[in-house]
Amino acid sequence: ALRTTAMQLATVAGPALGGFIYVLRPELPYAVSVVLMVIALACVLALRSRSARTRAAGGGAPDWRSVLAGVAFVRRTPVLLGAITLDLFAVLFGGQISLAPLFARSILHVGTGGLGLLRAAPAAGAVIAGVMLARRPSLRRAGRVLFVVVAAFGATMIVFGVSRSFPLSLAALAVSGFVDMFSMNIRSTIGALATPNELRGRVNAVEMVFISASNQLGAFESGAAAALLGAVPAVVAGGALTIVLAAVWPPLFPALARIDRLEELQPEQTTAPTA
């Protein structure tokens, strides 16, 4: 929760500051982004350099079999497969924040500063949820909570889609970030506790691929749906589909729905039997 909260703090500051910096000079946000990306790239290169030295000291490079072991483990572990795919489709259908520029300009009629606030609102809600989870990390009926917060995420998208009030739209997006933080926390905790130590890195890599794919595909789906249906119907339909997913997933993944306390998860108790 603390790690995700730190990431969300940056997500809050970035869009809000970007909107106001754009007012000063339109090209300035891009210049700032380039500088920050160069710094990030330098950090990544430093990590890769250290990793290369570690392999030279005795560790071998992983082969394809070890890479695919993470995918195979997710496929045969119902709680992991259910949590990851639920997040994938929820973001695919319900992640309508990519349409924020269209809503800011044509529906809410706010400027670049308002757009920055719209983009920052989900992260602001996520920070609040992250602080709450850090203070009280233990959840009862975590599996059911996961489905409830995913349905709530879809409901907030519907509210955002039909809203013509800027404060209401901000509130809807903030609540979407709040409930999405609970979803991310539950999913990431399931991934950590339901996975053996020797597979944890590879399973985490599978999760990251799903997360990245859902974000990018969700943005594409939102734009395509808005072009076909219009912005408001696209957002409302996406939110409704997300609620349907939250209702359909429990019967498909009953092991996920039965989870009570996350800290009680054990890898050997979550793996489906293999033939």
Question: What is the meaning of each model-derived region?
Answer:
Residues A1-A275:
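Alpha-helical transmembrane-bundle signature of multi-pass membrane transport and export proteins
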